[in-house]
Every structure is written in C-alpha cells, then in structure tokens.
C-alpha cells in the first residue's frame, strides 16, 4: 500500500515511518511547514531528510503557513480575546494534517496517511472510529475528535499499540542516527507557543490590562492583571480583599475585562453544552464517558444531541468547565465525536 507519512524531524514520526517500511509499504515522507522560525524549519527538514535517506523514501515539504495562520493561529488569539480557552491542536488536525496534507497525499496516489499520534483506528460495522492508544498516559485521541469517519478510514497510527517509554529504545536500535540529531526542546504541547501562551498573546493584543475581580453577587472584591491571563479554575494572580480561603476563577467577562471568582464548590456544574462538530445524526442519547479537558479522567455522564448542540448531564459535580475547550464523547475507549463547549 502507498502511504504518506507526516515527518516532524523527531523520533516518534521517524519510527512510525520505519515500522511501516518494515511492513512492506511504499512510503512518501511529508514535512509540513505550519508555524516555526525558518531556522527551526531548516533543522527539522534536515532531520526528516536523514530519516528518509535511511529508509530510501522521498520527502516532500509542504508550506501551509498562511493557511495555518488564518485557520488556527489567528483563531487561537481571537478565542482568548473572547475570554475562551481554545484547543488549537483539535483545530489543526482536521484542517491541516488530515485536511490539506491528506488531500495532497491522495493526489500523489497514496491510499492512506500516517502520523506519530498516540491513537488507534478501529473499524466497527464497516465504519472507522478513533480508538484510544494503548498507552493511556500519552493518548491523543482527544485532539482527533473533529475528524469525519471517511477521513479516519484513511489514517494509520503505527505507535497506537506501543508504550511511549518503549519507542525511543526501539527507534534508536532500528535507526541509530536518531540519537545524534539536533533538535529544539519544546516546552509546550502547542507547537507555536515557545514559552507560555501569554508571551504569544503579547505579540498581538494588550494582555496586561488591569481589571476588577467580582464575587458571584457582583460585588467588586479585588483586581486582576488582565483577563486573558486567566482560565477557569485558576486560583493565583489576582487579589481578593479579606480572603481567608482560596478563591478560583469561575467566570470571565471579556467585554468588561472582569473576573468572577468563587470558592472551589462554585466551580462545580451538573450540566454543560457544546456546539456539535462530529457526533453523527444516528447518535443515540444515553450514558457515555466524556472529557472536557485533555488531561482529565473520562467521566460518566448522560449525553444527548439536540438541534446541533451536545447536552451533558452529570450525576456527580463536574469541575472546571471552560468555554472553548473540546467536549469529547467516548463509548468505552472508542471516540464517537464531540464539539466546542459554549
């Protein structure tokens, strides 16, 4: 089978390509220029070329920087301006990697596209679904929730049945040169955030604009350093007059540059709504597992789909729901779809 492999210049994607080559597939390597300095791109492309030379496969470099900026980067900035907590990776995957890059791969005659994501694909009743990775500590299925079933059918995740701790030893044994490659230490899960998301925002918007802190009764009880520096659940970086116990951000009013704070129990909710992006029309209302944050434990809840909105009801209090985050619905370890929390 002819498969396109997205190569980042790192160990995971290189070993993904190696494992597919060992299975006898015809491969085409693809490096995506999305968002980085030219210096970084040059290094990553050089690393990807070394992997391709070792494997005896061609490498193509696709420049999607303009598309990425308008569809992902600018949306990230806009979401924070609106007081939301966005998920750029969940936006990038369907639009860039499994959108534009997949389209290009198909034009090259490839049947599928592979990446180093920690996830799996499982076919159920002739329909392809994303399945959680074997290594639950590294599972990235959450970020793939917006993919359509027709797209999922064209995906390959060679690392999905492996443990992260085993990848590097396996890769260095198979491709010894990987241990000598130069690289940049990535400090964040978001590729375009070098230090902190605040530093990224500062390049485009006024972040340090002091505002007031209010309690749930609407009374002014303190000040903050600028609403974009806070997310739901944060408990530091603002003042509360006469506070004898911790206070948490429970709401953000972007238009007024105000924070609403309360006690930990005020973070609790028994329901939430999300704008549906990928649950299909045949979705049956019932009890499922949901995630409302990437590194959260799946929580049982009653989920229903009504007029394009996903409605979730919890039996137990659920904490820290932030607008703009992805709500992802699972049946056991099978991802059914999800949406954006409103």
Curated annotation (Swiss-Prot):
Gene Ontology annotations for the cellular component aspect, listed alphabetically: cytoplasm
Instruction: Indicate where this protein resides in the cell.
Output: Cytoplasm
Asked if the Swiss-Prot or TrEMBL record annotates the protein with the keyword ATP-binding, the reply is: yes
UniProt keyword annotations, A-Z: ATP-binding, Cytoplasm, Disulfide bond, Nucleotide-binding, RNA-binding, Transferase, tRNA processing, tRNA-binding
Q: Into which family does the record put it?
A: Belongs to the MnmA/TRMU family.
Residue segments, region Interaction with tRNA: 138-140, 293-294
Which GO terms label this protein's molecular function in UniProt? ATP binding; tRNA binding; tRNA-uridine 2-sulfurtransferase activity
Residues annotated for ATP binding in this entry: 6-13, 32, 116
| Annotated catalytic residues | 92, 191
GO BP: any one term: tRNA wobble position uridine thiolation
EC number(s) from the headed UniProt entry: 2.8.1.13
Q: What cystine linkages occur within this chain?
A: 92-191
Q: Indicate whether DNA damage appears among the record's keywords.
A: no
Designated gene of the protein: mnmA
Q: Which organism is it from?
A: Helicobacter pylori (strain J99 / ATCC 700824)
Q: Which reaction does it catalyse?
A: S-sulfanyl-L-cysteinyl-[protein] + uridine(34) in tRNA + AH2 + ATP = 2-thiouridine(34) in tRNA + L-cysteinyl-[protein] + A + AMP + diphosphate + H(+)
> Which residues are listed under the site Interaction with tRNA?
117, 325
Function per UniProt? Catalyzes the 2-thiolation of uridine at the wobble position (U34) of tRNA, leading to the formation of s(2)U34.
Q: What is this protein called?
A: tRNA-specific 2-thiouridylase MnmA
Q: Which domain of life is it from?
A: Bacteria
